[in-house]
């Protein structure tokens, strides 16, 4: 199992913060070619978000996720639309089952801790729920739940595509 650590996420975030618009555009062009189904689905769903900042959050989160996995493996096989739909539907049903009586933080933490990439999923949740900031989330409760499931699906599929080797991303390597 490959693990993306908090240090690796911080390192990738630091790199993104120092990119200009042309560099970010080039990265996004590469993403669109490498993972068209994932990028298309996530960005397509983000168009439905009510708040522009939420759409920016989605693009930022997806950038961190895709760059994190690119650090593990340069040429990740593309996720197909069928793979995404099947995985997303299964994930959505599982989350509905777990949270059918409402949100329970203990259940949520258990899901994150047992996930294939717990620190990456925790990062996603922190951005979506705006943890650590005094401001409220840019997402409605329904939007937040949907995008947690979407990103959990994206992470799980990319994790699967990068193979079973045990490795940690070393941010000092970058």
Which ranges hold each PLM region?
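Long compositionally biased, domain-poor regions of proteins
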Residues: 1-5, 10-174
């Amino acid at each position: 199992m490959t693990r993306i650590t908090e240090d690796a996420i911080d390192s990738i975030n630091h790199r993104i913060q120092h990119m200009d618009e042309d560099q970010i555009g080039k990265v996004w062009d590469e993403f669109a070619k490498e993972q068209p189904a994932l990028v298309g689905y996530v960005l397509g769903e983000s168009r439905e978000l009510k708040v522009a900042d939420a759409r920016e959050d989605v693009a930022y989160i997806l950038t961190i996720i895709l760059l994190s996995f690119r650090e593990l493996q340069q040429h990740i096989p593309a996720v197909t639309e069928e793979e995404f739909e099947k995985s997303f539907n299964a994930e959505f049903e599982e989350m509905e089952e777990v949270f059918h009586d409402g949100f329970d933080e203990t259940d949520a933490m258990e899901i994150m801790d047992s996930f294939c990439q717990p620190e990456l999923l925790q990062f996603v949740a922190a951005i979506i729920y705006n943890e650590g900031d005094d401001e409220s989330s840019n997402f409605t409760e329904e939007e937040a739940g949907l995008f947690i499931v979407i990103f959990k699906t994206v992470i799980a599929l990319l994790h699967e595509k990068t193979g079973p080797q045990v490795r940690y991303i070393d941010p000092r390597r970058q």
